[in-house]
Amino acid sequence: MSSATLKGLFRSEEELSRLPASERIRYRLIGADCRYHANDNISAHIRDGELEELKAEVAQQMQGVLKSLVIDTESDHNTNETAQRVAKMFVEEVFRGRYVPMPSVTEFPNFSRLNELMIVGPIKVRSACSHHLCPIIGRVWIGIMPNEFSNLIGLSKYARICDWVMSRPQIQEEAVTMLAEELQNRVKPDGLAIVMEADHFCMHWRGVKDDESVMTNSVMRGAFLRDANLRREFLALMANKSRN
């Protein structure tokens, strides 16, 4: 449904308030011509109190899924509150990166004019594949080549940004690219390198059920693309940190 059609249907806040939270949020997204794919952050279009409403809505829909799976949640004490647990898990934890703003990150000027390679990692990350909503669990290494105009952020902030980006359904290739965009915009380094290695439970748990395979991908920008020696140094130090 187009933005114009929606605006024609819903003319007042009072009318909107009678809709489920998901429909109100979707209305705002479409009205602002914003995409809302599985790995998009939509927090700017969520108002106070709506996440609680959204959890209740998801729980209700999840109860319907359990019913369709012919699970007797009334007499089975193990599944009495499964729908509510799953809703809370999705909204507050594993898909949290969709629904909350990016964590606050304090940036500091590079007064010391640092221009040597910095590596952060391995950072443990958890995500979910958007195809089957199965877990993705892995590690991320970040290489930064700052310049005198770069911003510096605390080590823990790299982990917080990683968690925010990863906490949503997506494919690994897009997740690493999204993380690179956030760090490039924040730190503004001469070079940025990111490597992610992860287990995909959509492959371990179902389908071919191969529990040995991992997926590794990388993003190299700026100095890491231009300078093969810098790239080798990063990968060698990363491998050394992996063994320790």
Segments from the language model and where they lie:
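A domain-level signal for the structural core that forms small-molecule/cofactor-binding pockets
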Residues: 2-244
